[in-house]
Amino acid sequence: MPLTLTLPDWVASVAHPGMVVAEDDDRMRLAIRLARENVRHDTGGPFGAAVFERHTGRVVGLGVNGVLRLNSSLVHAEVMALADAQSRLGSFTLAAEGMPAHDLFSSCAPCAMCLGATMWSGVKRLVCAAAQEDAEALGFDEGPVFAESYAHLVRRGIEVIPELLRDEARAVFALYRERGGPIYNG
């Protein structure tokens, strides 16, 4: 039986691979919008992510949290966005020879699992909105993530930009709490 990972149908009405988003703030707003719509549609946790070609702003991968919808603890927004991008580009790495630099924008700082996926994905930049403590304040367990975790990414050539539009992402967490969204790993 094949393993199939799918995004909710509503994602196509928000964004699609190939669209261009020029500015970092707008790229992050897309990741945050994916998180917000995931909450509004009751299709998962309050997390969204997108992979972009750095210099063109072309979307190459989209992701939302699908842990509950797909019954898998592995299906976090960052992992989905990275898998979508790699699948579309036909490469296990986004740093293959001849490929442009790719950036991962995430509505929240990655958990331990997603940090590992980011490290091995081939992205050259990680941009986050909400901070680890924001997710933990909501009740999520982010696992063993330390300052050294991010220093390791930097040593591997991945630029890390934290807390871009943090308050906008925190508003999605507030919406999730308001709606009684489940904390599935706390």
Predicted regions, residues:
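A short, polar/charged loop-to-alpha-helix boundary motif
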Residues: G66-M80
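A structural microfeature
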Residues: V60-G61
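Short, solvent-exposed cationic patches
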Residues: H76-L94
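Short cysteine clusters
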Residues: C111-C114
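Zinc-dependent deaminase
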Residues: M1-N38, A117, S121-G186
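Short beta-strand scaffold segments in enzyme catalytic cores
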Residues: F47-E53, G57
